[in-house]
Design a protein with these regions (language model features):
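Walker A/P-loop
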Residues: 40-77
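Pre-Walker A (pre-P-loop) alpha-helix and adjacent loop at the N terminus of AAA/AAA+ ATPase modules
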Residues: 7-51
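Walker B catalytic acidic pair
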Residues: 50, 113-114, 125
Length: 237
């Protein structure tokens, strides 16, 4: 546990800095970025649903870059197996012992790209991790970082070769966000800003800088827990 503490004013300032960094690379989508920040501070997971070309994957990459968190990306495909996500215990012939080979889920911010393109058996590999922030392999539980956050994406247009997420999986997400197409003005700005790039730029190429670290993110989430929730608000919810 970090010894760093933050006030709510400092949390607000940090959130503004993160918005600013993501805004250097992502045109528009401010509501989506705000929801990502909310989920981060509430320690919940996010499902981004939108058509191709709405910067879902790139937005998650920029978000991770600004936070300074460990980042992994898994491209979900029909042949992806649970072990490709979680890892496995492999026998070491030199030591005659099993050695844990950690999968990409052992990170702080996991981008589960096109999560609905993999079968339910593989989707289920995320259930324990998202609910309990741990992974069990061969009967042994392995803790995930306190800041563990899953940002998943899916394309609602495709109907061939996709596997709709079951209710148990959807329940693990705090938010399902519908990512819209950019406006005409935003599209013009995207062309002006990125039209000269031969391929998709990286966040660092567009000036996205780290403004936080794991300890700061944990402290910010802890500070948010101090907000008083009035009974009238509870009744409204």
């Amino acid at each position: 546990m970090s010894d760093i503490t933050m006030t709510l004013a400092e949390v607000s300032n940090l959130a503004a800095q993160i918005r600013g960094q993501v805004g250097k690379a992502v045109v528009g989508q401010t509501a989506t970025v705000d929801a990502l920040l909310t989920a981060l501070l509430a320690q919940g997971h996010v499902l981004l649903e939108g058509p191709p070309g709405t910067a879902k994957t790139f937005m998650a990459q920029c978000f991770a870059a600004s936070l300074g968190l460990d980042f992994s990306r898994i491209q979900f495909t029909p042949d992806l197996m649970p072990g490709d996500i979680l890892g496995s215990n492999l026998f070491n012939f030199q030591t005659s012992q099993f050695t844990l080979t950690r999968g990409p889920i052992f990170t702080e911010l996991l981008l589960a790209d096109e999560i609905n393109r993999t079968p339910p058996k593989t989707q289920a590999a995320l259930l324990e991790a998202m609910q309990e922030r741990r992974v069990t392999l061969d009967g042994t539980a392995h803790a995930l970082p306190a800041n563990f956050l899953v940002v998943a994406t899916q394309n609602p247009i495709e109907s061939q070769g996709v596997y709709p997420l079951p209710e148990a999986q959807l329940d693990r997400f705090l938010f399902k966000l519908l990512v819209p197409y950019p406006s005409a003005a935003e599209e013009a700005k995207i062309i002006a800003n990125f039209g000269s790039h031969a391929g998709p730029p990286r966040p660092a190429q567009l000036g996205v800088e780290k403004v936080a670290d794991a300890a700061m993110v944990a402290a910010a989430a802890q500070a948010v827990k101090s907000v008083t929730l009035a009974d009238t608000v509870i009744d409204y919810i």
